[in-house]
From Swiss-Prot:
The keyword Membrane applies. This is Linalool isomerase. GO terms for molecular function: isomerase activity. It catalyses: linalool = (2E)-geraniol. GO terms for cellular component: plasma membrane. Residues 141-644 are cytoplasmic. The keyword Glycoprotein does not apply. It comes from Thauera linaloolentis (strain DSM 12138 / JCM 21573 / CCUG 41526 / CIP 105981 / IAM 15112 / NBRC 102519 / 47Lol).
Length: 644
């Protein structure tokens, strides 16, 4: 899944500069704004009416036209600037392109409408001066930040090679298939996911519901439930379907509810000015196609279920008359074609805004699709994608740019960071992933402290964090859980178990852990942060990557299947086949006692013997099915194999 370019070259920490596409966007901005300034001065230069002069001055910057009114009216200028900033936030928050455009042009028109017989003379100078001062202010801030970034890059260079060598060493050893089982602690976390996922399709008890545009959106909670359950399926219980399979299909189907994807109707209208075609898997919207393709592909790979390759199996219904028909093929076709047609290769989530992290999900979707259908889409796209990431989306300290405008090339601060997302990159480029983690782990090691018991924990000082890193992305409230769980997941993926344990200790000490009716969660965190926390509990070295590009060994798809087990009475900690047998580890979820297991994919008419916590035998029927009564008491291990 690596590009040949990355395989031939050593991994280097690169310092970003303004790339050619970004530079061309900036030049275009300058030309357009220069023309706008000429247009702004034209009414004054040609002696037009005060109304036209005031409206013209309003083109220099939002609200500048109010300066032409003089007196108290001029106070509307700073107020407009503040509201314009909110409009820009609405633009990147929900792709609402109309918000800043309407405010800028609308206030210019309003100033013209309010103008009297003559404008206030100093406004002719104050309006362009205010625009120039604003430009110089942001240039100064940018230059100061870039100088600081260059110093930070030098610091990173001092430790990068040594840290990268340690990453290679720690990530080299991965768990063997079939040699592990879910612990009681992990099962408590998995039950948190199952309680959410086993609800009927379209019900959302326990989910965080705030908006459907940014990280707290339902789609991201559903995706990460899918990622976590996919790892359970692939690494712990590949030979169990039952309620685990139902839970995974439920979240896939709930994702197609209009409540989840309907945000695209609004973004299409106020972002693309498209009022007729709201297909969520056509143009842009990698926050759906990339994430969903990755999610569905992972389920198909680990469960061996091909239903979502059928035409129309992943359709999105707008109303009684309109339905957008899709399947795993068309979802990934959309991702591939958008990558190929974008000037940046990386392409937008919301109209106009390109998030490199979201684009990692898109590359991951292609990677799992390649594994499923023996294609080479990733190899075709990845070399250019990585080049553009280095040249257009890397800052001068070597970090990824959080957010860049596709139309203007301007960047905005947003969630990013080596320590939070390297495990996603590991799916499609181990080189990129290890480069990111080599930086993240070393900088995090400076945040390790000793708690009152002398144990190592993670302490993240506020002064060292960006604003977004102090906010729980799943509910937009101040909180530490999301930062801790992101570190835990990355550390587990790359074999940094000491750092992962330090993050887990911090979670347990700071975030209010509770276990209620066998379900574990953290009270001081969003649903999304809790879901990430379960992923971190489950993961071991390479687990995230392998659940997308490797999957279970072929033997599990040939052997017997535990097809029926009641939830929550029976908790399945292991279900693994080496070809014709079935290894099970079960726990009682509602008290010790007798339970019935249902088996599928047995050899018809063959006698099977049961060893372990129970003994006996049974014979498969003509359809390869059978049932078995067992008594669960604590950890209950069974080994089922053909009799001789």
């Amino acid at each position: 899944m690596e590009s040949t370019r990355m395989l031939r070259q050593p991994i280097q920490l690169l310092q970003g500069h303004k790339g050619p596409v970004t530079a061309s966007r900036h030049r275009r901005n300058a030309v357009v704004y220069a023309l706008l300034c000429l247009l702004a001065l034209l009414p004054v230069a040609t002696g037009q009416s005060a109304a036209w002069q005031a409206a013209g001055l309003g083109l220099f910057m939002p609200g500048a036209g109010f300066l032409a009114l003089g007196g108290a009216w001029a106070l509307l200028f700073p107020l407009t600037v503040f509201v314009f900033w909110l409009a820009v936030i609405a633009w990147f928050w929900s792709g609402m392109v109309v918000a800043p455009l309407t405010l800028w042009l609308g206030t210019a028109a309003l100033a013209g409408w309010l103008a009297g017989e003559a404008i206030w003379p100093p406004a002719v100078y104050l309006a362009p001066a205010a625009a120039a001062a604003t430009f110089l202010f942001f240039q100064y801030r940018g230059a100061k930040r870039r100088a600081k970034d260059r110093e930070h890059f030098k610091f990173r260079q001092s430790f990068f090679a040594e840290s990268l060598a340690e990453v290679h060493q720690r990530a080299a050893t991965e768990p063997e298939p079939g040699e592990r089982e879910l612990t009681p602690d992990q099962l408590q976390g998995v039950r948190y996911l199952l309680e959410l996922a086993l609800q009927p399709v379209g019900q959302y008890k326990g989910y965080t519901i705030i908006d459907q545009f940014q990280p707290a959106a339902l789609r991201y909670q559903l995706n990460h439930i899918g990622f976590a359950l996919g790892m359970v399926q692939g690494h712990y219980t590949p030979n169990f379907q039952g309620y685990l399979g139902q839970a995974q299909r439920n979240v896939i189907d709930t994702y197609r509810e209009r409540k989840v994807w309907g945000y695209w109707v609004y973004e299409s209208m106020w972002g693309h000015f498209n009022f007729s075609d709201f297909d969520p898997a056509r143009k842009d919207n990698i926050m759906l196609t990339g994430w969903y393709g990755m999610h569905v592909g992972q389920y198909m790979l680990n469960a061996g279920d091909t239903r979502y390759s059928q035409p129309g199996s992943l359709s999105f219904r707008l109303n009684d008359k309109t339905c957008y028909h899709h399947d795993i093929h068309s979802i990934n076709q959309s991702v591939r074609e958008n990558f190929q047609s974008s000037d940046f290769c990386l392409y937008p989530c919301e109209p106009n805004w390109v998030y490199p992290v979201c684009n990692m999900y898109g590359m991951s979707s292609l990677a799992v699709y390649d594994t499923l259908f023996e294609r080479r889409d990733t190899a075709q796209v990845l070399p250019k994608w990585l080049h553009m990431l280095d040249t257009e989306f890397t800052d001068q300290k070597g970090s990824l740019v959080g957010l860049r405008s596709y139309w203007t090339g301007l960047e905005m601060p947003f969630y990013t960071g080596e320590a939070g997302f390297a495990f996603f990159a590991n799916i499609f480029s181990t080189d990129l992933a290890r480069k990111l983690w080599a930086v993240g782990r070393k900088e995090l090691s400076m945040c390790l402290t000793q708690d009152a018991e002398g144990q190592t924990r993670l302490t993240l000082p506020k002064e060292a964090l960006a604003f977004f890193d102090t906010i729980d992305a799943g509910n937009y409230r101040p909180g530490k859980l999301f930062a801790y769980v992101a570190v835990q997941m990355c550390a587990r993926e790359f074999g940094d178990d000491e750092l992962a344990e330090a993050a887990r200790r911090s979670m347990d000490q700071d975030c209010g852990p509770v276990v209620e009716n066998g379900v574990a969660r953290y009270t001081k965190g969003s649903t999304l942060a809790n879901i990430w926390g379960v992923e971190g509990r489950l993961m071991r070295t390479g687990d995230f990557r392998n659940s997308f590009v490797k999957g279970p060994p072929s033997s599990v798809f040939d052997g017997p299947l535990l097809g029926d087990a009641r939830y929550p009475e029976i908790l399945v900690a292991k279900a693994f086949s080496r070809g014709d047998d079935l290894e099970l580890v079960l726990y009682p979820g509602a008290g010790d006692g007798p339970q019935t297991l249902g088996f599928e994919r047995l050899k018809p008419g063959v006698r099977y013997v049961v060893e372990g916590a129970a003994s006996g035998e049974f014979t498969a029927d003509a359809d390869g099915r059978a049932s078995l009564a067992v008594t669960l008491s604590g950890r209950t291990a069974l080994h089922i194999k053909p009799g001789h």
